[in-house]
Amino acid sequence: MARTVNLKGNPVTLVGPELKVGDRAPEAVVVTKDLQEKIVGGAKDVVQVIITVPSLDTPVCETETKKFNEIMAGMEGVDVTVVSMDLPFAQKRFCESFNIQNVTVASDFRYRDMEKYGVLIGEGALKGILARAVFIIDKEGKVAYVQLVPEITEEPNYDEVVNKVKELI
């Protein structure tokens, strides 16, 4: 059966595998706002938080990114990346407008590698962009936490994310 999330109550199908806690986190190449490639996933010397959002130009994604920027401000030993399909130029403008400095904002426009995380929307008005989700990857490169937000227009559970990150760092 196809995996779905809802857009204003209507189901949309997701493309790619369903990652579960304990799975190896695939490496994915994204492009930062400064046009540099960054690899997310896999084993690293820090805990990784990979946040996928549909577009920074929407109110919920804007709020979510600003909130994670604020929440992660004092955390050491964690690398946070917010990934959308927005072009890096728009992401740079967004980061400058809202003083986003504590998370990396990156785009999946070049390789569509986030399909490896099963969050690419495969149909409907949002086909080709990313669903709202949060993945926490431990230092060994294993998925430690997954939150696929069931309704695209809603924010994730921030407290769950923070608690899991604190547990791992």
From Swiss-Prot:
Keyword Oxidoreductase: yes
EC number: 1.11.1.24
Signal peptide residue numbers: none
One Pfam family named in its UniProt record: Redoxin
Keyword Disulfide bond: yes
Domain Thioredoxin: residue ranges: 19-167
Keywords: Antioxidant, Disulfide bond, Oxidoreductase, Peroxidase, Redox-active center
Cystine crosslinks: C61-C95
Domain of life: Bacteria
Matches recorded under PROSITE patterns: THIOREDOXIN_2, TPX
Catalytic reactions on record: a hydroperoxide + [thioredoxin]-dithiol = an alcohol + [thioredoxin]-disulfide + H2O
InterPro entries: Redoxin, Thioredoxin-like_sf, Thioredoxin_domain, TPX, Tpx_CS, Tpx_Peroxidase_subfamily
Function: Thiol-specific peroxidase that catalyzes the reduction of hydrogen peroxide and organic hydroperoxides to water and alcohols, respectively. Plays a role in cell protection against oxidative stress by detoxifying peroxides.
Protein family per UniProt: Belongs to the peroxiredoxin family. Tpx subfamily.
Name of the protein in its database record: Thiol peroxidase
